[in-house]
Each structure stands twice: as structure tokens, then as C-alpha cells.
Design a protein with these regions (language model features):
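N-terminal hydrophobic/helix-forming segments and targeting peptides
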Residues: 1-465
Length: 465
């Protein structure tokens, strides 16, 4: 049951649609390298499409009815878009769910120090990373610093053309014999992933008893104060992420792919939001969820295990006049969901890690993973065969190219998504996303055809499920 390459069927008009979609996606990927920025941009997209903040609806005491479009944000890191359909909410929703946090390095709360006449910022890695990926590459600092007076300072240094960049040094090959003999996981100690941020000391009189003990660090702090009006202590209440510097780019002489940071999982989040916005009138209410903390287990107030989704649905059902606890439970259990997350693209260089009959191939369309997990499907959501059949029918009716796959060979490893968390309500859920190469590396690869088919598939699901 080999699936064909999606590129072979495209008309000139479809190629034009594909390129337009991917131009927007490249801009989104380049400009939104943190979950906060993704949500901020998602809200802007929604408002431009006529969505209204749910908090405004509640404050004004308005009722919700079919055709109304609302959004809700959670701590600036989650976003829920809702398009109310003509069917009673109790009959369930059609849901897309993706995450917008990506593997990265986070600054520690007390990060600044000086060593070897250079200023550094200490980090703690976030998510599943290979430490050796992060050395000797241009890096940017993106995030927020929250001050005691209640103000928030946005930080974004390293992505503009005239910005300085940062880096983590690597050991020169001439002195690396011991390092090169270590397993890859030990070659670069995660504790020494320290970002170089300065190399120039402040001027001072050597006889001055008040001269700074760390003059290069002090110069960095002085620059920070001058440019952003923040003190060293403000790092205690900061969330600054170290991410690769530079934009997403077309890849290949044929420009068929995109190289960028954060395809996992913004390559699913962006087409999900677009599909939600582009679907006009629906019978079953459509919902798109953009969430945080998936890379570390979906925990905390902004992870999928929080009550944000459930609470927001309860608010909406109350405003729509369906406010009984039983109606809420029925609505959740009768819902259908595509858990939109990336899959492992088949890589010929590592062919032994895949089983090709059930592998995701680049350019063959939207991926469906009936189950994920590892070592006997542990920790997975295993979609019902009846639901898989329904999804197949929707995709075929809409002419969407899709493929079914697993995340590598049996016992080769594995992974998980938010699917099992949503399935606890009793709703039907299947994992559905885009195949990528170099997953969790600084620069991941996605095929434009797969992004286009993801958008088409997500839109068809919202309209027809």
C-alpha cells in the first residue's frame, strides 16, 4: 500500500496555493520562536478573522450562538479558537490540537557569570535535545523579563540583520581526542552549555576599592540596563529562551522543502490555525487548541493536563445556554480530534531505524499515527479502527494525500503527544501531522507538499467530521 508522492498530482494553481501557504508559514516560523510569540501572533490572526476574546463576551454578558467566533488565551502560552456550529454543543466538537513549545535552552534564574575574561549566561535545556547540537552555532535570546513594578520587558536579540548574535563554544579538534572517544550523549556536558554574551570589560581604576570583580560581566549588565532598563536581579523573574538565530529558508534547488527552527510542532500549529480561520459556517463546532509544555510532558498550568480546555468549554457552553454538567461531559465524550504533531520522516542515512512499510516519507502527504508510544505502545493513544475508517473517508472525499506511519522500528525508541490526554474524556483521537527530518535539532526539515496537505486535511476534518 505504498502512497504516491503528492507533488505529482499538483496543478499550477495548487502549486501557487502551496507556495503562498508556505511563504506565510516561513514568516510565522521565523518571527515566532517562543510559545508566547506564537500565541500572540495567533491572537492577531484570529482577531483579523473576526474572532472575539471570550473574556470580553463574558464581561459584556453576551450570549453565544451559531456563527459566533471566540478565542481564549491562557497565561499567554495557550490559545483556543472556537467557531460555534449550528448543531447543539452537546453533540460534540471537531478539534485540532498542536503545541508551540519547542526544544531549546532556557536561562537559569541566576545566569550571569564571568570566566576567562568573557561574560556568560548559564542555561538549562528544555525538552529532548542532543547537547552537541547547540555548540558553535549562532544563537538568539528571546523572551520576557518581568519587573517588580509590574512591567514586562520583551527581549529579542539575534534575529534582526544588524543584531549581535551569541554562541556556545566547542572544544577545538586538536584537543578533542578524549571528547571524541565518548558516547555522543556525553561528548558535551549539558552543564557547560553556557552562552557567551560579552568579551569587553568596563573601564575602571585598578586601585579603586569599589572596582567590579567581574568587569566583563558588569559591561554586559550595563548594556542590558542601558538598552532594556533591567537589573541583574530581574533575571529572577524572567523567561528567556536561547534559540537558533536566523530565519526559516527554502531548502533544495527546487525549493521543495523548508529548513527552520521549531517545525516541531509549529508546522502543525500554523496550518491548524489557518484551517480554523478559513472554515466559515460549520455544523459541529470547530475548535483549534495551541498549547505549551508538550516537550516536557504537557505538565503545569499551560500544559494539556491543565484544566484550561475543559474550563473554557464549560464557559462557552454556559454562554450558549447548555450549562448542565452532564451536557459538558457528553460534549467532550462525543468530540473528535486530530492531535496535530510531527512524525519522523524516513531518512535513508539512518534507514535501519525505520520499517519502511509503516514509515512517513517526505512529500507523501499528511501523516496519521494510529498509535505512538514506545516499547509495546507504552504511553500511547491507540485510535479505534472505526475512527480511523471515518478519518480515511474524510481525507479521500476531500482528495487529501495522506500516509499512515509509526515512529520508527519496534523498540528503536518512540515518543508521545497530547493525544492520550484528550482521549481521557472518551473522545476519538488520532495523531496527525507532518513528517520532519532532524527532529529536535536546531534546524529541522519539512516538505512543502506535506504542509499543504496538512492544511487541506485539517480543513476537511473541521468541515466534515
Amino acid at each position: 500500500m505504498e502512497r504516491p508522492c503528492a507533488w505529482k498530482k499538483y496543478t499550477p494553481q495548487q502549486i501557487e496555493e502551496l507556495e503562498e501557504l508556505c511563504r506565510g508559514y516561513k514568516q510565522f516560523l521565523s518571527e515566532n520562536k517562543t510559545e508566547r510569540l506564537c500565541v500572540k501572533t495567533g491572537i492577531k490572526m484570529a482577531e483579523e478573522a473576526g474572532y472575539v476574546d471570550l473574556e470580553t463576551v463574558i464581561a459584556e454578558g453576551r450570549e453565544l450562538k451559531a456563527g459566533d467566533k471566540v478565542y481564549a488565551a491562557n497565561h499567554g502560552k495557550d490559545l483556543m479558537l472556537v467557531n460555534l456550529g449550528t448543531a447543539p454543543l452537546e453533540q460534540g466538537f471537531n478539534i485540532l490540537g498542536a503545541h508551540v513549545d519547542s526544544p531549546r535552552l532556557d536561562l537559569k534564574q541566576n545566569p550571569a557569570f564571568e570566566a576567562g575574561d568573557m561574560a556568560y549566561l548559564d542555561t538549562h535545556y528544555y525538552g529532548g535535545v542532543k547537547s552537541y547540537h547547540w555548540v558553535a552555532s549562532p544563537l538568539a535570546l528571546v523572551g520576557v523579563i518581568c519587573k517588580k513594578d509590574g512591567t514586562t520587558v520583551d527581549i529579542n536579540i539575534g534575529d534582526k540583520e544588524d543584531d549581535p548574535v551569541f554562541t556556545i563554544s566547542d572544544l577545538l579538534i586538536h584537543l578533542s581526542s578524549e571528547q571524541m572517544s565518548k558516547p555522543a550523549k556525553d561528548a558535551v556536558d549539558a552543564e557547560i552549555l553556557d552562552v557567551i554574551v560579552g568579551g569587553r570589560p568596563v573601564k575602571f581604576d585598578e586601585d579603586d576599592k569599589d572596582a567590579p570583580k567581574e568587569p566583563v560581566k558588569q559591561m554586559f549588565l550595563n548594556n542590558l540596563k542601558e538598552q532594556y532598563d533591567v537589573e541583574e536581579e530581574d533575571f529572577l523573574s524572567a523567561e528567556i529562551e536561547v534559540v537558533p538565530a536566523g530565519p526559516a529558508r527554502d531548502m533544495g534547488l527546487d525549493r521543495s522543502m523548508i529548513l527552520g527552527y521549531g517545525h516541531d510542532d509549529r508546522v502543525c500549529a500554523y496550518p491548524s490555525m489557518l484551517a480554523q480561520i478559513d472554515v466559515a459556517n460549520v455544523e459541529r463546532t470547530s475548535i483549534t487548541l495551541i498549547v505549551d509544555k508538550e516537550e516536557i510532558g504537557s505538565v503545569g498550568a499551560t500544559g494539556m493536563t491543565s484544566r484550561f480546555f475543559e474550563n473554557t468549554v464549560a464557559e462557552i457552553m454556559t454562554l450558549a445556554g447548555e450549562d448542565s454538567p452532564l451536557a459538558l461531559r457528553r460534549a467532550l465524550a462525543r468530540s473528535r480530534m486530530l492531535s496535530s504533531d510531527v512524525s519522523a520522516g524516513f531518512d535513508p542515512g539512518y534507514a535501519g531505524k525505520f520499517e519502511t512499510k509503516n514509515a512517513a516519507f517526505m512529500g507523501r502527504g499528511l501523516c496519521f499515527n494510529k498509535y505512538t508510544g514506545s516499547r509495546g505502545k507504552g504511553g500511547s493513544n491507540d485510535a479505534d479502527a472505526e475512527y480511523v475508517a471515518l478519518v480515511r473517508d474524510i481525507m479521500d472525499e476531500a482528495g487529501v494525500d495522506f500516509q499512515t506511519c509509526e515512529l520508527g522500528r519496534v523498540n528503536a525508541g518512540g515518543g508521545g503527544t497530547i493525544a492520550y490526554i484528550m482521549a481521557k474524556y472518551g473522545m476519538n483521537v488520532i495523531d496527525s501531522g507532518v513528517a520532519v527530518l532532524s527532529m529536535h535539532a536546531l534546524w529541522e526539515v519539512a516538505n512543502k507538499a506535506d504542509i499543504y496537505e496538512a492544511y487541506r486535511g485539517y480543513k476537511a476534518f473541521l468541515e466534515r467530521a
